[in-house]
């Protein structure tokens, strides 16, 4: 953001860190070049990027960079704004005011294209006694640089479902099948 240059922002954050007013500094949605600029001024402990099984743009450069630099990743939107819940199918309409209403990713054409993939992923999850949500969160947790996954629950059952994403994992051949489905 040109209004808040990285150098100026990170200099201020480093001053707060040195004064003991903040212990750790994290950034959100930075690319590798931005993190390099920031690291030249101030240590960074975490990055909060958009990351899900359907949006894996960070895997090529950001994920390896953060692992090398010891920066913990705290992914947001791990369920792709609800796409990885399996609830949204062609014909679904969001109410006025919902941020997903009118977004291309939720149009019928995209939902139609995703449906077979989501069904196949759901079948893999169910074979392990898990849900698509749990598989989707677990996939991110298996990345060494991911410190935790930022999920939100509207009710206790959703929170319980999210907790069930940890403490298990697919076999290598199952992950290979997940990769094949997502290609």
Regions found by a protein language model. Give the residues of each.
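Beta/alpha (TIM)-barrel catalytic core signal, keyed to glycine-rich beta->alpha loops juxtaposed to Asp/Glu
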Residues: 1-182
């Amino acid at each position: 953001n040109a209004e808040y240059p990285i150098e100026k922002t990170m200099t201020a954050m480093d001053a707060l860190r040195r004064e003991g007013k903040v212990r750790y500094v994290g950034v959100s949605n930075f690319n590798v070049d931005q993190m390099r600029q920031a690291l030249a001024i101030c240590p960074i402990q975490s990055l909060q990027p958009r990351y899900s099984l359907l949006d894996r743009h960070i895997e090529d450069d950001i994920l390896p960079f953060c692992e090398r630099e010891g920066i913990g990743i705290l992914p947001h939107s791990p369920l792709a704004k609800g796409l990885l819940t399996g609830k949204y199918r062609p014909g679904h309409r969001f109410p006025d005011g919902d941020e997903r209403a009118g977004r291309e990713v939720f149009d019928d054409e995209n939902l139609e294209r995703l449906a077979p993939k989501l069904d196949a992923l759901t079948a893999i999850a169910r074979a392990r006694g898990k849900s698509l949500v749990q598989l989707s969160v677990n996939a991110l947790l298996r990345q060494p640089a991911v410190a935790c996954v930022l999920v939100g629950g509207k009710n206790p059952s959703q929170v319980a479902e999210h907790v069930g994403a940890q403490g298990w994992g697919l076999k290598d051949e199952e992950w290979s099948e997940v990769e094949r489905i997502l290609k």
